[in-house]
Amino acid sequence: MSDSAGLIAHNWGFAIFLLGVVGLCAFMLGLSSLLGSKAWGRAKNEPFESGMLPVGSARLRLSAKFYLVAMLFVIFDIEALFLYAWSVSVRESGWTGFVEALVFIAILLAGLVYLWRVGALDWAPEGRRKRQAKLKQ
Protein backbone atom coordinates (compact mmCIF):
# COMPACT_ATOMS: atom_id res chain seq x y z
CA MET A 1 0.00 0.00 0.00
CA SER A 2 1.40 3.42 -0.93
CA ASP A 3 1.82 6.25 1.53
CA SER A 4 -1.06 8.34 0.17
CA ALA A 5 -3.46 5.38 0.23
CA GLY A 6 -2.41 4.59 3.80
CA LEU A 7 -2.90 8.20 4.81
CA ILE A 8 -6.39 8.23 3.31
CA ALA A 9 -7.27 4.91 4.94
CA HIS A 10 -6.01 6.17 8.29
CA ASN A 11 -7.87 9.51 8.23
CA TRP A 12 -11.13 8.67 6.44
CA GLY A 13 -13.18 8.92 9.64
CA PHE A 14 -11.95 12.43 10.35
CA ALA A 15 -12.64 13.46 6.74
CA ILE A 16 -16.22 12.21 6.97
CA PHE A 17 -16.68 14.00 10.29
CA LEU A 18 -15.32 17.24 8.80
CA LEU A 19 -17.63 16.95 5.78
CA GLY A 20 -20.56 16.33 8.11
CA VAL A 21 -19.77 19.42 10.20
CA VAL A 22 -19.39 21.65 7.13
CA GLY A 23 -22.57 20.20 5.63
CA LEU A 24 -24.53 20.73 8.84
CA CYS A 25 -23.34 24.34 9.11
CA ALA A 26 -24.23 25.01 5.46
CA PHE A 27 -27.66 23.40 5.97
CA MET A 28 -28.44 25.52 9.05
CA LEU A 29 -27.29 28.75 7.38
CA GLY A 30 -29.26 27.99 4.23
CA LEU A 31 -32.38 27.05 6.16
CA SER A 32 -32.26 30.23 8.24
CA SER A 33 -31.86 32.38 5.13
CA LEU A 34 -34.85 30.64 3.51
CA LEU A 35 -37.14 30.73 6.54
CA GLY A 36 -36.04 34.03 8.08
CA SER A 37 -37.97 37.25 7.56
CA LYS A 38 -36.71 39.58 4.89
CA ALA A 39 -38.54 42.79 5.88
CA TRP A 40 -36.16 45.61 6.71
CA GLY A 41 -37.68 48.72 8.16
CA ARG A 42 -37.20 51.35 10.78
CA ALA A 43 -38.32 49.05 13.59
CA LYS A 44 -35.76 46.42 12.58
CA ASN A 45 -32.90 48.87 12.99
CA GLU A 46 -33.85 49.96 16.52
CA PRO A 47 -32.34 48.25 19.56
CA PHE A 48 -34.66 45.85 21.37
CA GLU A 49 -35.20 46.62 25.03
CA SER A 50 -37.61 43.88 26.13
CA GLY A 51 -40.73 45.53 24.75
CA MET A 52 -39.98 48.94 26.26
CA LEU A 53 -39.43 52.08 24.25
CA PRO A 54 -35.70 52.74 23.81
CA VAL A 55 -34.32 55.30 26.24
CA GLY A 56 -31.16 57.14 25.33
CA SER A 57 -28.48 56.00 22.95
CA ALA A 58 -27.31 52.42 22.65
CA ARG A 59 -23.77 53.67 22.17
CA LEU A 60 -22.10 54.35 25.48
CA ARG A 61 -18.57 55.59 25.96
CA LEU A 62 -16.65 53.37 28.31
CA SER A 63 -13.57 54.32 30.22
CA ALA A 64 -10.27 53.01 28.93
CA LYS A 65 -9.86 51.33 32.33
CA PHE A 66 -12.37 48.68 31.30
CA TYR A 67 -10.25 47.77 28.28
CA LEU A 68 -7.11 47.72 30.41
CA VAL A 69 -8.73 45.37 32.92
CA ALA A 70 -9.97 43.17 30.07
CA MET A 71 -6.46 42.92 28.62
CA LEU A 72 -4.95 42.16 32.03
CA PHE A 73 -7.58 39.45 32.54
CA VAL A 74 -6.77 37.85 29.18
CA ILE A 75 -3.04 37.92 29.89
CA PHE A 76 -3.33 36.38 33.34
CA ASP A 77 -5.90 33.88 32.06
CA ILE A 78 -3.45 32.63 29.43
CA GLU A 79 -0.77 32.39 32.09
CA ALA A 80 -3.14 30.29 34.22
CA LEU A 81 -3.62 28.05 31.19
CA PHE A 82 0.14 27.51 30.99
CA LEU A 83 0.26 26.67 34.69
CA TYR A 84 -2.59 24.19 34.24
CA ALA A 85 -0.68 22.45 31.44
CA TRP A 86 2.34 22.26 33.75
CA SER A 87 0.26 20.85 36.61
CA VAL A 88 -1.06 18.07 34.37
CA SER A 89 2.47 16.98 33.47
CA VAL A 90 4.15 17.61 36.83
CA ARG A 91 5.14 13.97 37.34
CA GLU A 92 6.86 13.71 33.95
CA SER A 93 8.70 17.02 34.24
CA GLY A 94 10.25 16.34 37.65
CA TRP A 95 12.30 18.89 39.55
CA THR A 96 13.40 20.66 36.39
CA GLY A 97 9.80 21.40 35.49
CA PHE A 98 9.10 22.48 39.06
CA VAL A 99 11.96 24.99 38.99
CA GLU A 100 10.81 26.26 35.59
CA ALA A 101 7.28 26.73 36.96
CA LEU A 102 8.66 28.63 39.96
CA VAL A 103 10.60 30.93 37.63
CA PHE A 104 7.44 31.45 35.56
CA ILE A 105 5.40 32.28 38.68
CA ALA A 106 8.14 34.68 39.86
CA ILE A 107 7.97 36.49 36.51
CA LEU A 108 4.18 36.68 36.84
CA LEU A 109 4.44 38.10 40.33
CA ALA A 110 7.04 40.64 39.18
CA GLY A 111 4.65 41.77 36.44
CA LEU A 112 1.77 42.01 38.91
CA VAL A 113 3.87 44.04 41.36
CA TYR A 114 4.94 46.33 38.51
CA LEU A 115 1.31 46.91 37.46
CA TRP A 116 0.38 47.57 41.07
CA ARG A 117 3.24 50.04 41.60
CA VAL A 118 2.53 51.90 38.35
CA GLY A 119 -1.13 52.24 39.35
CA ALA A 120 -2.69 50.22 36.55
CA LEU A 121 -4.88 48.42 39.07
CA ASP A 122 -6.12 51.59 40.82
CA TRP A 123 -9.62 52.74 39.92
CA ALA A 124 -9.52 55.90 42.00
CA PRO A 125 -7.45 58.69 40.42
CA GLU A 126 -6.47 60.30 43.75
CA GLY A 127 -4.82 57.10 44.94
CA ARG A 128 -2.80 56.97 41.75
CA ARG A 129 -1.69 60.58 42.16
CA LYS A 130 -0.58 59.97 45.74
CA ARG A 131 1.36 56.86 44.76
CA GLN A 132 3.10 58.62 41.86
CA ALA A 133 4.01 61.56 44.10
CA LYS A 134 5.46 59.13 46.65
CA LEU A 135 7.50 57.36 43.94
CA LYS A 136 8.97 60.66 42.69
CA GLN A 137 10.29 61.57 46.16
UniProtKB/Swiss-Prot annotation:
Transmembrane segments: 12-32, 66-86, 95-115
Enzyme Commission number(s) from the entry: 7.1.1.-
GO CC terms: NADH dehydrogenase complex; plasma membrane
Catalytic reactions of this protein: a quinone + NADH + 5 H(+)(in) = a quinol + NAD(+) + 4 H(+)(out)
UniProt keyword annotations, A-Z: Cell inner membrane, Cell membrane, Membrane, NAD, Quinone, Translocase, Transmembrane, Transmembrane helix, Transport, Ubiquinone
UniProt xrefs under InterPro entries: NAD(P)H_OxRDtase_bac/plastid (IPR023043), NADH_UbQ/plastoQ_OxRdtase_su3 (IPR000440), NDAH_ubi_oxred_su3_sf (IPR038430)
Pfam families assigned: Oxidored_q4
Name the UniProt record assigns to this protein: NADH-quinone oxidoreductase subunit A
Subcellular location: Cell inner membrane
Assembly description: NDH-1 is composed of 13 different subunits. Subunits NuoA, H, J, K, L, M, N constitute the membrane sector of the complex.
Functional description taken from the UniProt entry: NDH-1 shuttles electrons from NADH, via FMN and iron-sulfur (Fe-S) centers, to quinones in the respiratory chain. The immediate electron acceptor for the enzyme in this species is believed to be ubiquinone. Couples the redox reaction to proton translocation (for every two electrons transferred, four hydrogen ions are translocated across the cytoplasmic membrane), and thus conserves the redox energy in a proton gradient.
Chief location of this protein within or outside the cell: membrane
Family in the record: Belongs to the complex I subunit 3 family.
Membrane topology listed for this record: Multi-pass membrane protein
One Gene Ontology molecular-function label: NADH:ubiquinone reductase (non-electrogenic) activity
